[in-house]
């Protein structure tokens, strides 16, 4: 009997290097140092290390974390301040960055408060799914508008303070000068005080100094407002076509949405971001909701200004006010409803422009 052996299939050679295990990075951010911790997908803490807040320190942190396995996700605290630069660096390295806001209170009560514990808690928040918010990119037109509005608000506040100081000093000057300036408008008063001669009197010198400071701050406010308007027109010009929306309100809402508005899952998430969504406060047989006092308060204030403008100028809004008033709602409650409607409209315009690819803004 002839026995014919069958050909044996060729098996692939065994891999010399096993696949790297997935790990998760958590970072507790500070001004001068970042503390990082690495955990496995099973929740085992591998190590924690401190790194300087420099470009070299960021690269060292990434290399250190990758030495433990395949790094695909990272939880970073304070992505809008101390952790902003690190979050951008990790995103450019194709790592999914998750914003971690609130610490794990149970873990803090159990292990105390240290930077290493906070870094570990950030990693575990990503692992458990408790932290799932995509941070703002911090690069683009919205980031430009944020710093411009920051400088503008600071200049407006300083100008108001200088005006109040000028009028306070004016009360104690020579009666003849005070009577000559008392009937002038604010603009004329500032212009006149800026041209007062230096007669050696401390009060007169202070009036002239404050008036010139106000004039300089006014120039700054106008220039910053012009740049904000230009940024909005180049980024989302369609927002300015909405009734009641001006450049400053549009900028506040765009800053809240960020340069990556696709991170917002729905208009409800945008409403919650702006603090115009009710919060459930039910228990047992009691079913109720309370006012949302969280969210971005500048965006909330922008929605309020838009609603107030519409109540004065928009026929549809005034008809809505009349109808809701007849139903027994107070004006404050009606304004809250209108703010939610405006947030829905703004969200649609932002997402529509984002899908079409809005142009970037130039400063």
Indicate residue ranges for each PLM-predicted region:
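Glycine-rich, often acidic, oxyanion-interacting loops/wings at catalytic, nucleic-acid
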Residues: 147-238
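Gly/Thr-rich phosphate-binding beta-strand-loop-beta motif of the actin/hexokinase/Hsp70
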Residues: 18-40, 122, 155, 252
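Short glycine-rich, Thr/Ser-proximal phosphate-binding strand/loop in the N-terminal lobe
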Residues: 31-56
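Short alpha-helix plus adjacent loop in nuclease-associated cores
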Residues: 91, 97-137, 143, 147, ...
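Short, basic/hydrophobic alpha-helical segments
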Residues: 56-73
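Phosphate-backbone recognition surface of nucleic-acid-processing proteins
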Residues: 241, 247, 251-331, 360
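Short glycine-rich phosphate-binding loop at a beta-alpha junction
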Residues: 70-82
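Charged, flexible boundary elements
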Residues: 1-18, 222-223
